Amino acid sequence: MASVGTLAFDEYGRPFLIIKDQDRKSRLMGLEALKSHIMAAKAVANTMRTSLGPNGLDKMMVDKDGDVTITNDGATILSMMDVDHQIAKLMVELSKSQDDEIGDGTTGVVVLAGALLEEAEQLLDRGIHPIRIADGYEQAARIAIQHLDKISDKVLVDINNPEPLIQTAKTTLGSKVINSCHRQMAEIAVNAVLTVADMERRDVDFELIKVEGKVGGRLEDTKLIKGVIVDKDFSHPQMPKKVVDAKIAILTCPFEPPKPKTKHKLDVMSVEDYKALQKYEKEKFEEMIKQIKETGANLAICQWGFDDEANHLLLQNGLPAVRWVGGPEIELIAIATGGRIVPRFSELTSEKLGFAGVVQEISFGTTKDKMLVIEKCKNSRAVTIFIRGGNKMIIEEAKRSLHDALCVIRNLIRDNRVVYGGGAAEISCALAVSQEADKCPTLEQYAMRAFADALEVIPMALSENSGMNPIQTMTEVRARQVKESNPALGIDCLHKGSNDMQYQHVIETLIGKKQQISLATQMVRMILKIDDIRKPGESEE
């Protein structure tokens, strides 16, 4: 092992260690280290703050290759931000955790963590120990989560009445670039989830929902297809563009004459030899096509390609085919059509065929772009959301927005309790934490009050982004919540003339809101317990 330093002795013979390269290392300790962390976290949170809510602004991210992404999604913004500070990287991870677990609320969790650290900075300046602040935050988070359980309402999750789910999805999509048609998008997301949901296990398999996009048309042209869309076309332009009552052979084996496993060499010495080889290949192809047709199949979908000669023979024998279909699409087609994937040609039987009511090739506008749509499948639990849009950026943002909406609906199927948005839940929790703080006889009381103040940053950011006076709006709503004992009163971001979020149908999932508070508190607690940073300094040239 490499030596880390040199052992030396003082004048009394006592040993001490001189650590190597200590002069080239930077070190921050105590309050200075904490302030450095808080400053980095605040910088990230302040960047995200303007993206919060239905009137939140989008961010344009340009990567090293010059590719542009315009997005409102917190996790996407943070993942594309080029951050160097260690704590800023932790904020990125925090947002990713929220995205992986819940799928929505990624901006809010970062803004809340930044507000908690900002409040902690003021307490540190007043001489309160970081551990006491962390403990106070922990107590306050527990109270807030218990209070959320008390003020939550249940939403009826019923396939025959999807309206409550649509209203929740609309809240999620309200802040996105697709909010011009968010009712339509919410309906598409809800129908997709309810189609594939397993209501007995209360779970949703996202593998059965495929999201495809094609540039052209308008966002309003987006539709839900009860089947699979593949970004391929029939292998020959003269093949029929539509196959009705398709019996599909799903092949992952090469569509070509078999090759010996061992190394081999074939000498073609004359024209006759070459013709004989060509004849053998043709006979073998015809034999394979005959084998497919004997099973009753009238469409072949291959993972691998086949040459032009085979393509011509398929056309001659009236067997439409699709080549170079990717692995995930092959699996989805097999699930949707109820077919079995055939890895060896010899194993193909009629029992392994998939069934679809219609397989057709569709074209787009004046371009040569074509796609294959497989509909009316045997298993109706596989769906595709097909997005249209003016450019690639809008389609990518629509995909991210729909991902958030799909996650929110899945969370409602798992746990159908909701709280009201527009900052209503945060204001109610802040009031509950403040009341409990007054009963706390220890120093943690200050931290609990600071936690309540931090919770109010979310509704203040919402009102600020909506062009209101944040302090005045916040004061009025807080006073009304206490006076009317109504935890559904929040910020009227859309200027509809009512602060009642229940009336406005601004709904958020309870599981998502709990996760926000819990993750932000854990993160802040971890940061407050760091009091020493050592990192290598700039190397001397």
From Swiss-Prot:
The N-terminus is blocked. The keyword DNA repair does not apply. ATP binds at residues 53, 106-107, 422. The keyword Phosphoprotein applies. GO terms for molecular function: ATP binding; ATP hydrolysis activity; ATP-dependent protein folding chaperone; beta-tubulin binding; G-protein beta-subunit binding; mRNA 3'-UTR binding; mRNA 5'-UTR binding; unfolded protein binding. ADP binds at residues 53, 105-107, 175, 422, 492, 508, 513. GO terms for cellular component: cell body; centrosome; chaperonin-containing T-complex; microtubule; myelin sheath; zona pellucida receptor complex. InterPro entries: Chap_CCT_epsi, Chaperone_TCP-1, Chaperonin_TCP-1_CS, Cpn60/GroEL/TCP-1, GroEL-like_apical_dom_sf, GROEL-like_equatorial_sf, TCP-1-like_intermed_sf, TCP-1_chaperonin. Its EC number is 3.6.1.-. GO terms for biological process: binding of sperm to zona pellucida; chaperone mediated protein folding independent of cofactor; positive regulation of telomere maintenance via telomerase; protein stabilization; response to virus. SUPFAM superfamilies: GroEL apical domain-like (SSF52029), GroEL equatorial domain-like (SSF48592), GroEL-intermediate domain like (SSF54849). Pfam families: Cpn60_TCP1. The modification N-acetylalanine is found at residue 2. The modification Phosphoserine is found at residues 26, 346, 539. It comes from the Eukaryota. NCBIfam families: chap_CCT_epsi, thermosome_alpha, thermosome_beta. Component of the chaperonin-containing T-complex (TRiC), a molecular chaperone complex that assists the folding of actin, tubulin and other proteins upon ATP hydrolysis. The TRiC complex mediates the folding of WRAP53/TCAB1, thereby regulating telomere maintenance. As part of the TRiC complex may play a role in the assembly of BBSome, a complex involved in ciliogenesis regulating transports vesicles to the cilia. Component of the chaperonin-containing T-complex (TRiC), a hexadecamer composed of two identical back-to-back stacked rings enclosing a protein folding chamber. Each ring is made up of eight different subunits: TCP1/CCT1, CCT2, CCT3, CCT4, CCT5, CCT6A/CCT6, CCT7, CCT8. Interacts with PACRG. Interacts with DNAAF4. Interacts with DLEC1. Interacts with SPMAP2. PANTHER family: CHAPERONIN. This is T-complex protein 1 subunit epsilon. It comes from Mus musculus (Mouse). The gene is Cct5.
